[in-house]
């Protein structure tokens, strides 16, 4: 069965979203057209507003509606700690976990020479400028534990060599609640290499 040209156009447009295939796009479109046209109008309005007004923080490069995001504007954050992440989603995950009170720098990707993505494409020139300010004492590399993420972390580490800025990497290992028999070999090996002294609670 073929829908009208406008419906077909809507289906095709919905498929630009990650993880949305033909069937999912059809369910979304038909739901909005049949059952929730008001919701569809709100979606269009919100998306239009976001596309029009959301840009990038001039300091950390995360998504923001103002020149500086709320985190960069927060005087309570520790300017000496700078966490480098690949995406705004990674930054949000760290914020939601709580515990980190430093600032961020968002790469919006990782180095990938085969895809033509070099240092300037992920803002490493801007990271150099940020570090040249002198307020950063430690850089925490929180790139993903993938081949590209590791390559990016090593590149940044080379950039920092001789600058006097401390460098650390997020620890990776066995997840809380996980069982060793289900942990892959690479993760288990990294957990052993990054093991810490056992802190016993005083009775």
Swiss-Prot record:
Record family assignment: Belongs to the RecR family.
PANTHER family: RECOMBINATION PROTEIN RECR
Gene Ontology MF terms in the entry: DNA binding; zinc ion binding
PROSITE patterns per record: RECR, TOPRIM
Zinc finger (C4-type): 57-72
Alphabetized Gene3D superfamilies for the sequence: 3.40.1360.10, 6.10.250.240, RecR Domain 1
UniProt keyword DNA damage, yes or no: yes
BP term (GO), one: DNA recombination
Toprim domain segment(s): 80-175
Xref: Pfam families: RecR_C, RecR_HhH, RecR_ZnF, Toprim_4
Name of the protein this chain belongs to: Recombination protein RecR
Key words of the record: DNA damage, DNA recombination, DNA repair, Metal-binding, Zinc, Zinc-finger
Gene name of the encoded protein: recR
Keyword Glycoprotein: no
SUPFAM superfamilies named in the record: Recombination protein RecR (SSF111304)
Role according to the record: May play a role in DNA repair. It seems to be involved in an RecBC-independent recombinational process of DNA repair. It may act with RecF and RecO.
